[in-house]
Amino acid sequence: MEKWFNVGKIVNTHGIRGEVRVISRTDFPEERYKKGNTLYIFMEKSKEPVAVTVKSHRVHKSFDLLAFEGYDNINLVEKFKGAMLKVPESQLGELDEGEYYFHEIIGCTVVTEEGETIGTVKEILTPGANDVWVVKRDNGKEVLIPYIEDVVKNVDVETKTITIRPMEGLLE
């Protein structure tokens, strides 16, 4: 049984030439939405996903706009509104050392080098130079952990544990 990963949600159409507006859920949109790549559209009322090939990708405002080969007008893509774009695990590809997919990090337990449990990674923000991991503490408060060498000392995706050395004031 193939495992599937969300890479985006089609929220609307764009224009009349078959483009769809996507809220991206992928770590690497420029790679995932590259021309010629195959994506799979999962619609609520359909049992089988629809395989589509990316014809074009561009960013407009805060959305990714995608067009698919063979879908060149609004009437053909209207049915995809609300559908999820996914890829099979086999398409994920290898990452360089120190790089991780979001799904590998979200859900990890964060501990200090002294063994104090900080909380669980709930979300990943991508504001610019480095990612920021949103960690929910047991008391419900959130802590923002920058993914930089000075702070993150070890990531073990097998045991879902991240070891950090907090900078002064980071956990306050």
Swiss-Prot record:
Protein family (similarity comment): Belongs to the RimM family.
Chief location of this protein within or outside the cell: cytoplasm
GO cellular component terms, semicolon-separated: cytoplasm; ribosome
A GO term, aspect molecular function: ribosome binding
Subcellular location: Cytoplasm
Domain observations: The PRC barrel domain binds ribosomal protein uS19.
Coiled coil: none
SUPFAM superfamilies noted in UniProt: PRC-barrel domain (SSF50346), Translation proteins (SSF50447)
Function in brief: An accessory protein needed during the final step in the assembly of 30S ribosomal subunit, possibly for assembly of the head region. Essential for efficient processing of 16S rRNA. May be needed both before and after RbfA during the maturation of 16S rRNA. It has affinity for free ribosomal 30S subunits but not for 70S ribosomes.
Keyword set includes Cytoplasm: yes
Domain of life where this protein originates: Bacteria
Entry keywords, A to Z: Chaperone, Cytoplasm, Ribosome biogenesis, rRNA processing
Keyword Cytoplasm listed: yes
GO BP terms in the entry: ribosomal small subunit biogenesis; rRNA processing
Quaternary structure, from the entry: Binds ribosomal protein uS19.
Name of this chain's protein: Ribosome maturation factor RimM
Domain PRC barrel intervals: 96-170
